[in-house]
Amino acid sequence: NEAWGQFDALKVCDFVRSLDSHRVIDHASGWYDQGGGDIDSMHKYILPIHLRKSKKRAFVVTEFGGYSNIVRGHTWNEKKAFGYLMFKSKESLTKAYKKLLDKQIIPIIDKGLSGTVYTQVSDVENEVNGIYTYDRAVLKIDENVLKDINSQLRY
């Protein structure tokens, strides 16, 4: 994943494929794409997403979003909370999430986007960019807006 160490990505991809040819392989999740595996994987925060077309591999935005909100009393460590883009309220976070999907994700579905992974499902330790809080007690985005916008992600 990213800069955690990408050594011989194509060689490792071939090795994994030799062990199990039925699994989908993302050989360079969000890092230097060498054209291997089944997925052209992009991690994109804040900046616009530009679709890359390929006849051989699925284009997947394997990390995007990172929108953050601190919910007092439901955070692992409020003093060290990190997020790519911080919002002060559930309402402002909901509005930004909807705008992100409306402007960046939904328009490229019909153009070849195969999948997305929003960062992230829940807060983890110092990262407060989850849809749910660290303790999974609070949904940080309005449930009805979340259902409505996410229902548009189906092809």
Predicted regions and their residues:
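Long, highly charged low-complexity segments enriched in Glu/Asp and Lys/Arg with interspersed Ser/Thr
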Residues: 146-153
